[in-house]
Every structure is written in structure tokens, then in C-alpha cells.
């Protein structure tokens, strides 16, 4: 706000760490952005990847007024592995913002939807709930397997239990290595190049 911020990008769950934002946290973000007239772009593409007691709360559900200064992005690409169909959903409740968006898309000629992608998107959202449940169970079972593997074979390395997403994060602090030593060990012994 001090730097004349015009837009805030909110990723929920937060990629790449998998944090699932709680309602009070979303409310705090929303109120700050509303007060300072900041446009919020809400990336909810990973909304289905939530585990345990964590719940994905759509930004629009936190407060009806947030629809006036936000744009929500979703897609079937992550949950249903449909990225190749290049289909996504852009939800713009504010008519003025939607008009600006539509005019911009028309000007650049990127407003033609992928017909096959639309059918796949509708089918995924309307008929594949069982598949989503089974996929989430499978992904979470992978976390459990990896966690057990670490406990049995590398007890100084711990899985950071995810709230959401499908990425594994591991905690190396108990290994007693500084950053440079850890990077060298990962490269030379594990064959893993760190970015």
C-alpha cells in the first residue's frame, strides 16, 4: 500500500507450499485490499487439493463485497489433468471489470474457447466427483508412504505435512548442515540439483 500497490495476487491454496488460507486470513487480505482499492486476482486452480481438516474457502464466499474488486481464476487442468486442452474459468462478478477484460480479449483475439476443452471441463465438473475423491486419496497415500520412508530410512529428514497441493516439502534442519553443505550433499550424493 505504501508503494501504491494496484494489484494483489492471492493463490489459494498457496502454490508452491500448499498453505490453505483460513477464513479470517482471507478476510484480513480482503479488507486491506478493499480499503486501499487494490484489485485482487485470486488463483484458485488448486482448490480441490486440500487435505485433513483444512477447507478451501472461495474468496467470493468470504464477503459479498469482495466481488467488486476481485477476479477469480479456476481451471480443471490440475484436478483433472486437462492442461493440454487449455481451458480455464475466469469469474468476474463486477460488470465494469468484466467489460474491460472482454474488450481486452477481443482486441488481442484470444477470446475463442477450445470447444473440446469446454466439453471436458463441463464433464469433469459435473460427472467426476468420485474420480476426484479417489485421486486425492491416492495423492495423500503418496504423502503417507513418503513420510514413512523418511522415518524408517532418513530419520533426520521430516516431511512437512501438506495442507493442500500435491508437492512434498521436506525439513532438513536436523541434519546439521548449512545451506551450502546441504546443496553440495544433495547434488553429489542424491543427484538432485536445487534451484
Please describe what each predicted stretch is.
Residues 33, 63, 150, 186-187:
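A generic structural signal for well-ordered alpha-helical segments
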Residues 41, 71-73, 160, 193-195:
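Structural detector of well-ordered beta-strand residues that form the stable sheet scaffold
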Residues 157-158, 170-195:
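Conserved C-terminal alpha-helix-loop-beta "cap" of PLP-dependent enzymes
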Residues 122, 137-147, 159-172:
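Conserved glycine-rich beta-strand-loop-beta hairpin in the small C-terminal domain of fold type I
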Residues 1-52:
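Active-site phosphate-binding strand-loop segment of PLP-dependent enzymes
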Residues 35-36, 66, 190:
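Helix C-cap/helix->beta junction micro-motif
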Residues 64, 68-140, 147-148, 152:
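Conserved core segment of the aminotransferase class I/II
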